Amino acid sequence: MAKKPTEKQLYKLKNEWLGQFFEEVKPKEFYRAVFPEGSFERKGHFEDGKANGIITIVENDKAKNRIVFDDLSVIDEVKGAEFAVMSPVAYSGRNRTAANARWLYGIAIDLDGVEMPQLRDVFHQMNHDIIPKCTYCINSGHGLHLYYLLEKPVPLYKHLQDKLREFKYELIAKVWNRYTSTFTEREQVQYQGIFQGFRMVGTQSKLGKRYPVKAFETGERVTIEYLNGYLMDKSKAVTDFHYKSDLSLAEARKKYPEWYEKRIVQGERRERWHVKRDLYDWWLRKIKEGASVGHRYSCLCVLASYAVKCDIPEDE
């Protein structure tokens, strides 16, 4: 009976197997794929008005964040760090919080308990359309990080964040199964949200500095619609969203000159829906006819809303 490889031997075996079929990419190449040129604000160019990546580094039990600008120069600076994590998300501000999250560039799944049979089965299932094919496979040491990079980023509006979290949980339940992980009990599955940061490519894995996190390009970019097709619970599919526009501000100026003049040059706010004052007068009559006790406040709120839509003067 063959002796079971140690974790460090297994790390090397996984790299060798992945290297037979896929191209290994350097850290900066990987993060340029995650965040294409133009995704982030340029250093010193606040006028860009864009979000940025954030790296969290833990040293001596203290965590600090570093901003990633569009040149990605900081990626080289953190290479070899003992513990540095980053998520495929662009943030405004300096903290990786849900409130600061602006754009989702991909879905990253942490698959633990991956030995050689499980590694081979992951790609067997991908090749036979059982689970979605990932864009990059990361050897994180003990397991794999599967990155599904989106063709276009998705805006992280507050109402979408919970939907995307449930969507990702359902995707994890599909990918993490009894053939892809040695952790076969459902309670052993690790469910992480969309903001979860993962050990960065080029930094140390849990096995130490001689065992860096490595990335292999394994597939194409994907869409949310493509991933929806693999969900076991179709009610978790994300459909009410839109992708980031390809138009730059300069291109929008040429294509929509009137919009550019009003919104950008003159700084006008987006137009509201305007209604004739008949609606306001009708609701005011309804209130005078008898707003019931306990509902007066709600009636006045609706009246105020109609007043705005009907352009009723404040003094009235």
What annotation goes with each model-predicted range?
Residues 152-154, 234-316:
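Modules that initiate DNA replication and primer synthesis
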Residues 76-81, 141, 145, 195, ...:
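Short, well-structured alpha-helical interface segments that form or flank functional binding sites
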Residues 117-128, 150-181, 208-226:
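Helical (often loop-to-helix) elements that flank the catalytic cores of nucleotide-handling enzymes
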Residues 109, 132-163, 190-206:
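Histidine-centered divalent-metal-coordination microenvironment in nucleic-acid enzymes
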Residues 110-118:
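Short, surface-exposed ligand-recognition loops at beta-strand->loop->(often short) alpha-helix junctions
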Residues 91-99, 123-141, 184-190:
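Catalytic micro-motifs at enzyme active sites that drive phosphoryl/nucleotidyl and oxygen chemistry
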Residues 1-106:
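DNA replication initiation on ssDNA origins
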Residues 62, 93, 179-265:
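Catalytic "initiation/cleavage/transfer" segments centered on a nucleophilic residue
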